[in-house]
Amino acid sequence: MPPLALLKLMNLISPALPVGAFAYSQGLEWAIDHGGIDTPEKIHDWLQGVISQGLGKTDLPVLFKLLQAWGANDHEQINSWNAWLLAARETQELLDEDRHVGKALAKLLRDLNVPGAEPWLERPASLLTLWTLACAHWDIDAESAALGFLWSWLENQIAVAGKTLPLAQTAAQRILQRLMPVLTETVAAATQIKEEDFGASLPGWAMACANHETQYSRLFRS
């Protein structure tokens, strides 16, 4: 990947990107407080499951489709996969987060003069739809885009765990290090999934997100 494209990807996955993803826990706060996911080992196992069985079978295959569609300027496919992603969110909390962060990224990309971003301010947009628009515009290759997407998600989840648990910084880094091979394996596996097999349901994750919507005391947005 060209150095400038690499820098653009680093910008896109930075926690400093002003899209508000830090405000959401994706059910992890409830899982820690009420679901017994309260040790570094359990955090690792939870995140590994969501990455490999959830994001890897739902978001990543569509990421590749969206990159192709943006490259071909195929707006029918872009709209179709955007709607598919929103429909795949298993709880209201996950749907609201996806639309909120997607709109925030659309606004940012518009302000950065990325062509094609502005129309998404007026319609429901999945984060991944705008993420792939940015990657296509900045010549970020598909594998790097997929790894970057997973890494951004994972870092945010580790931040959630650090704020909710007494999770030491070194323990958090150990989790990240252990999950790096999972990210590469998940991206490779996602390239082999046939379109009719896109999608997955994780009942435990969905229940954690649903319960977080009504959690009495919480740090993260619902």
Swiss-Prot record:
Keywords: Chaperone, Cytoplasm, Nickel insertion. It is found in: Cytoplasm. GO terms for cellular component: cytoplasm. UreD, UreF and UreG form a complex that acts as a GTP-hydrolysis-dependent molecular chaperone, activating the urease apoprotein by helping to assemble the nickel containing metallocenter of UreC. The UreE protein probably delivers the nickel. Belongs to the UreF family. PANTHER family: UREASE ACCESSORY PROTEIN F. This is Urease accessory protein UreF. It comes from Hahella chejuensis (strain KCTC 2396).
